[in-house]
Amino acid sequence: MHRYRSHTCGALRESHIDQTVRVSGWCHRIRDHGGLLFIDLRDHYGLTQCVADPDSPAFKDAEKLRAEWVVKIDGKVRRRPEGTDNADLPTGQVEIFITEIEVLGPAGELPLPVFGEQEYPEDIRLKYRFLDLRREKLHQNIMTRGAIVDSMRKRMKEQGFFEFQTPILTASSPEGARDFLVPSRIHPGRFYALPQAPQQYKQLLMMSGFDRYFQIAPCFRDEDPRADRLPGEFYQLDVEMSFITQEDVFAAMEPVITGVFEEFAKGKRVNSVWPRIPFAEAMQKYGSDKPDLRNPIEMQDVSEHFRGSGFKVFARMLEEPRNQVWAIPGKGGGSRAFCDRMNSWAQGEGQPGLGYIMWREGNEGAGPLANNIGPERTEAIRIALGLGAGDAAFFVAGDPAKFVRFAGLARTRVGEELNLVDKEQFALAWVVDFPMYEYNEDDKKVDFSHNPFSMPQGGMEALVTQDPLNIKAFQYDITCNGFEIASGGIRNHRPEAMVKAFEIAGYGEQEVVDRFGGMYRAFQYGAPPHGGMAAGVDRIVMLLCGTNNLREISLFPMNQRAEDLLMGAPSEVTPKQLRELHIRLNLQEE
């Protein structure tokens, strides 16, 4: 028999009854039932009930065991007594009668329990992550993550993609987020950077004659804490293709992402046909460029019904051409209590309130707005929104560029409060036609709105002849349930177009050469049309595991202060290490 086990803790079945077996694992739970000692032994594969009575030669050893001790148990498999089966366990019909116990690794007093999975402070969980990872839910999430990544790889290869690995030590690229810098010992005063993404390398691969690249790529960004991204590093399914259009990217990636979601959806519906929503339409209908399409609410511009109306606040606003009034329909929300609750919520969000109209029996409009604009306009709004008795509509007004974020939050709130959101589906969609540029109010200049290497719709002619803020790019996102899970674009592959695109954003040609010299040189020697995307592995896994916390699907994450509490990073280093790197610290005194 093997030194440590003949079977795993998840393997034993009725067919093993009367066999002598050996299992090893952790003491998950120990119960004393009137002289009978029950030990639930756990390993990576499952859990087996082991039992010792006072007649067992191992009883005294069993009495000494404590939670999370690692032990080896020899014994005989037997049928559980009638009425004690556990249908929740694959091993739930059998137990091991213990004949011998060997302690392989005793455990001290636990800083957090493994059994029971009680809520514990996050910093404790991260400091003792090796204990936290023994807990069933987190352990299963990590296994699911591995299976999802395997599925991605398999499906990418089925689509004809090849996996490549690009460098981890690269040059600093000042655009975007801050880089993690790595000082060079050999080249004093010079630094490598960890890649924020393999963007330039994957484009260089296409210029090197390769096609259909992918990798599960680690990405590093020295960003301030964000609720929707882990500090430090994250992983993406990185993709690039040559001689393709936007349609080719969609055709290649839809089956991959749909297939992964269908495989791990656990009974939830996954739409096989993805809507394609222009960016401007997404913002107007949903108040977000990553709309949650499980929520059926679509906002509408109802400005015409308030222009010149008796509701002077909106009527005066609409005298300014850029201002609009948007309506958020709320099916089933036509109660005074609900409307007052939404108004209070809006005030909590820093707004003066949230105007509303309710419709009662006979489709009669009610509320301050209805009283001010009159029955004819109220009825026109009801018809436009497709509402009836028992429904309500909420209104936001002003410059859409300023209120759109709040409008999106209000749409989400109404949908959730009225239980309109279908929690049993994954609603996937493309968002397309992103603006190439946006106006940076802080710096008073035009900036790239997304990826600076994307191709403008209309090419060089658009860059030369159009208002930059009207130029659309061949850029696209994949959204799911209110999350952006992928982003990509068709690339600028002509050097003159690349230089012009950067010039509009305030970069001179020499600055482009200095910052992106490798790619700029490659453009001079025959660059194919190419494009791709990157899908967020962490977010996809988070959605499929049914959690809203990225730390629940990551092995050893940092906390929100970008600290690894288990390994003690970031840490001080020795003066000798600093001297070797030609670094002198200049820290502010506390």
From Swiss-Prot:
Its main location: cytoplasm. It comes from the Bacteria. One of its GO terms (cellular component) is cytoplasm. HAMAP family: Asp_tRNA_synth_type1 (MF_00044). One of its GO terms (biological process) is aspartyl-tRNA aminoacylation. Its EC number is 6.1.1.23. It holds the Pfam family tRNA_anti-codon. GO terms for molecular function: aspartate-tRNA ligase activity; aspartate-tRNA(Asn) ligase activity; ATP binding; nucleic acid binding. Residues 199-202 are annotated as: Aspartate. Homodimer. Belongs to the class-II aminoacyl-tRNA synthetase family. Type 1 subfamily. It catalyses: tRNA(Asx) + L-aspartate + ATP = L-aspartyl-tRNA(Asx) + AMP + diphosphate. L-aspartate binds at E175, R221, H450, R491. Keywords: Aminoacyl-tRNA synthetase, ATP-binding, Cytoplasm, Ligase, Nucleotide-binding, Protein biosynthesis. The record marks H33, G83 as: Important for tRNA non-discrimination. InterPro entries: Aa-tRNA-synt_II (IPR004364), aa-tRNA-synth_II (IPR006195), aa-tRNA-synth_II/BPL/LPL (IPR045864), Asp-tRNA-ligase_1 (IPR004524), Asp-tRNA-ligase_1_N (IPR047089), Asp/Asn-tRNA-synth_IIb (IPR002312), AspRS_core (IPR047090), GAD-like_sf (IPR004115). PANTHER family: ASPARTATE--TRNA LIGASE, MITOCHONDRIAL, ASPARTYL/LYSYL-TRNA SYNTHETASE. Aspartyl-tRNA synthetase with relaxed tRNA specificity since it is able to aspartylate not only its cognate tRNA(Asp) but also tRNA(Asn). Reaction proceeds in two steps: L-aspartate is first activated by ATP to form Asp-AMP and then transferred to the acceptor end of tRNA(Asp/Asn). This is Aspartate--tRNA(Asp/Asn) ligase. The keyword S-adenosyl-L-methionine does not apply. It is found in: Cytoplasm.
